[in-house]
Amino acid sequence: MGNPTFKSYYQDQLMAFPPTLDDLVPKSHTVRVVSDIINKINLDVLIDSYESKGRASYHPAMLLKVVVYGYINNIYSSRKLESACKENVHFMWLSAMNYPDHNTINRFRGVKLKDTLRSIFDEVVMLLAQEGLLSIKEVYTDGTKIEANANKYTFVWKKAIQTNKEKMKKQLESIWEYAQSVSDKEDSLPDPPDFTNIDSEKVKKAVDTLNKALSKTKNVDKKQRAKMNYITKNFPGNIEKYEQQEAILGERNSYSKTDKDATFMRMKEDHMLNGQLKPGYNVQISTSNQFIVNYTLHPNPTDTRTLQAHIEQHESSFGKVLESLTADAGYGSEENYDLLETKNIKPFVKYNMFDKQQNTNFNKKTSFGSDKLHYDPDKDVLYCPMGQEMSFIGHAKRKTTSGYEQTLKKYQAKNCHGCPLNGACHKSNGNRVVEINHSLKKHREKVHELLNSEEGIEKRKKRCYDVEPVFGNIKNNHKFKRFMLRGKEKVEIEWGLLAIAQNIRKKVA
């Protein structure tokens, strides 16, 4: 049997005309697209953020290319990006043989891009729009929750703070009552202050007053003395801590001590199947042809209250150009419908019962719900299932958690006694009373017609394969399920880089 033959292999062979890095990068490679796009956009805002004094800095265009290309290839760590610039031909070509270390990359990402990345992202979107790849006028909007880089056991809950403050209030009232009962008549305590809105100033004054009163009193009960010592030692510090925590919470119900901007939310990835809450951010995006056109981050676990800020960001970036918005039932509130109507944006936005109403079997069922009652606008009356008039009896006002005020009308039937449908129609005693939100009802009727039009059916179909696959691609294909940076400002930078990376990947595909 003969010897095997191999191709020549001389590791130390010198080359008379060695190839350049440019020769090693294919002409159609993604890395060239990254370089071309960043070369075309205006980076003046980023360049102006550098000072003219001191040692020469790495060029921001080079650092931006390296970071964006890293995010395209699932390289999110600054240390791995540092290594790639020394070991990977594509990164070496992008950086022109510069070798920024991980501290430089981190400072660039966390500091230099803080006030500039949004304008860079907008420039990329406008460049793609000019090429006809996307539209900034018709978008598909959806949200997802992404876990924050925070310890899931370092939580602060608003309810816990309120409970602790209520306990403090009761203990102060109790010790005050005791001090009044044992104090001398000439040194008797006045009535206790109002602890309803307890704060640090009230607590400090109350503690000082109680200590003075009890110090003048003989034979103070040992348990009460121990209780007063505990209050003196802990309450002033605790109430200050609670006030600081409430200031951080704002309108939220929780936050993480590790990342104070993160809110505890229920994630889709629940491997223990116990509904555990984790600190995270609600990421909202608008897409067109699977390109990300706009993004915002929110502390709200639900999508309903995110739409206004999301649209305002779109207008801030591109002006008032939005013509239509398509979204799921999570956005179908009266407040959002009013917002879209005010801004003349076509609302292809489902409401919570829309999908059920599409089912013919559901519509055939006899329903006694208030939305099924016939309304006569001329008489301003409703008709119950038995045909009896239900007269208007007054208004009801409600405020949503966002502060939006809803106006409802109340109607009452005249005689439900002895009605054969009484048990099925309503369970309460007396005549049936219903509340109707006519404004929301009109919005839903308009949206129902719009969604069932030819254009609406097409929009509903496209939403499923336009915006939703973008999240699936980023979270599953590119393994980004948890932010690496902390604080909302840095997390927004991170998501902005992911959005630019997604758009370039889509352009190349």
Where are these regions (language model features)?
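Anion-binding and metal-coordination hotspots
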Residues: 4, 8, 67, 74-87, ...
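A short secondary-structure junction motif
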Residues: 40-45, 88, 92, 477
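Conserved catalytic-core motifs characterized by acidic clusters
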Residues: 95
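Hydrophobic alpha-helical membrane-insertion signals
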Residues: 1-32
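A generic alpha-helix surface/boundary motif
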Residues: 15, 63-64, 122
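Basic, short loop/linker segments at the boundary and entry of helix-turn-helix/winged-helix-like folds
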Residues: 26-68
